[in-house]
Swiss-Prot record:
The modification Phosphothreonine is found at residue 15. InterPro entries: UPF0489. It comes from Mus musculus. Residues 218-228 have a biased composition (Polar residues). This is UPF0489 protein C5orf22 homolog. The modification Phosphoserine is found at residue 285.
């Protein structure tokens, strides 16, 4: 890790590795801020290693950027999908590494270099990234429209679980009946370690793409290649971590098994209508900047209109009200949607309907309920990856089970396996089960 100005040398050290386990993911941020305040983490240049089925890299759309400098006000504004970027704008995180499973493909693979800053026209936080993940939420602005710019290096890296093909030394694994090899996206070694650095003057979003996007089937003959991928990718992540002064390990348990809870709330036809109403068509990759501005403006108006529709329906969903909104271009399917909802429930939760719609842009939320075997393969992949990296300053874990993103029937089992991995790698832990009323320590 870097040692700029001796910052790292002046940091305090924990006797035992703190592990904070929360329910909703945004609840980890106060513990990271606490570590900054106690000088266990630096105020800036923190690397953030984020294992999750969701990027969590959106931004509270209407929150004034300066809210980040009032931490109590900030914590009250955050939700599960938008808690990381405010910490980037505040200057704390400079490198974010999103490690994702095969079923989560929300952001393009590779290295993304862009700016996070204050939009001079709206005073909200915005980015210069042109990835559809940000465009679909109306978060892109040109560089010259930002002030107080913070450069961010975002590396998106795929973690692939493979079954064990060759005999493996029991001493080099977490205790398990199945000990698969680590396999990570083969394109990532070049993407993350190509020598390209993010600079504050970069325009837009520089992306080094993956060389392959397909999920490859495990093969015993490929075990040597898998080990090479493991070494190369771990080395690339290590190079990224070296540019920071400290690193935080963050794990969402839905990384190992994930549900799209909205699929259980709505019928197939209702969900299809939501996809039609909220759809976002990805722009051409060669669209000029002014064209992207137009795309974002149109998308913002679309989302504002839909928010107004469902806010109005919360006040009253009479046939007259529904027909009035449905007469607008693109809103015709509102009539069958409301009719279907009212048949199934006495009082539809239109606010929840809107929240579900917001997830239906250019792709669906990931949905993959893993078998116990699949979970074990991913657990071992994570073990071998972390074994190649330095010890983090602290670990944060989100259960994500009360909102059904991590299957509630699996979450305790997954949590136990993750804590076993951490104990195996780092020894005695200072574990805080924040989600539990008793919050025991171990």
């Amino acid at each position: 890790m870097s040692d700029t100005g001796g910052d790292r040398a002046r940091l305090r050290r924990y006797t035992k590795l703190p592990v904070w386990v929360v329910e909703d993911h945004q609840e980890v941020l106060p513990f990271i801020y606490r570590a900054i305040g106690s000088k266990h983490l630096p105020d800036s240049n923190i690397s953030f290693l984020h294992l999750d089925s969701h990027p969590d890299l959106l931004i509270p759309v209407n929150m004034p950027a300066d809210t980040v400098f009032d931490k109590e006000a900030l914590f009250g504004e955050l939700s599960i999908e938008n808690w990381i970027m405010p910490a980037v704008y505040a200057g704390h995180f400079s490198q974010v590494i999103w490690l994702h499973p095969t079923w989560a493909q929300q952001i393009r693979e590779g290295k993304h270099c862009f700016l996070v800053g204050k939009d001079i026209s709206t005073t909200t936080i915005r980015v210069t990234s042109t990835d559809s993940y940000f465009l679909s939420d109306g978060l892109f602005v040109p560089e010259d429209q930002l002030e107080n710019r913070r450069p961010l290096q975002l590396d998106v890296i795929l973690v692939e679980p493979y079954t064990l093909c060759s005999k493996q030394d029991d001493s080099d694994s977490v205790s398990s009946t199945k000990k698969p090899k680590l396999a990570l996206g083969s394109g990532e070694s070049s993407a993350a370690a190509d020598g390209h650095s993010c600079s504050e003057g970069r325009r837009g979003d520089a992306v080094t793409p993956r060389s392959d996007h397909a999920c490859q089937e495990p093969s015993c003959s490929r075990s040597g290649g898998q080990q090479s991928q493991n070494t190369a990718t771990a080395g690339a992540i290590l190079d990224i971590l070296k540019t920071g002064d400290a690193f935080v390990l963050d794990i969402d348990l839905d990384f190992f098994s994930v549900k799209n809870p909205f699929k259980e709330m709505f019928t197939q036809d209702e969900y299809k209508i939501l996809q039609e109403l909220y759809q976002f068509k990805k722009p051409d990759s060669n669209l000029p900047e002014d064209g992207l501005v137009d795309v974002v403006e149109a998308r913002t108006h679309q989302l504002e209109d839909l928010e107004a529709v469902f806010a109005d329906l919360c006040d009253g969903d009479s046939e007259e009200t529904v027909q009035s909104w449905a007469s607008n271009p693109g809103m015709e399917s509102l009539v069958p949607l409301v009719q279907s909802l009212k048949k199934r429930m006495e009082v539809p939760d239109y606010e929840m309907v809107h929240q579900a719609g917001l997830t239906c842009d250019y792709s669906e939320l990931p949905h993959h309920i893993s078998t116990e075997e699949e979970i074990e393969y991913l657990i071992q992949s994570v073990y071998f990856l972390l074994k190649s990296l330095p010890k983090p300053t602290l670990v944060t874990i989100a259960r994500s089970s009360l909102d059904d993103y991590c299957p509630p029937e699996q979450v305790d089992m997954i949590q136990g396996k993750v804590l076993d991995v951490l104990h195996s790698l780092y020894g005695t832990l200072d574990t805080h089960l924040v989600y539990s009323e008793e919050s025991p320590l171990s």
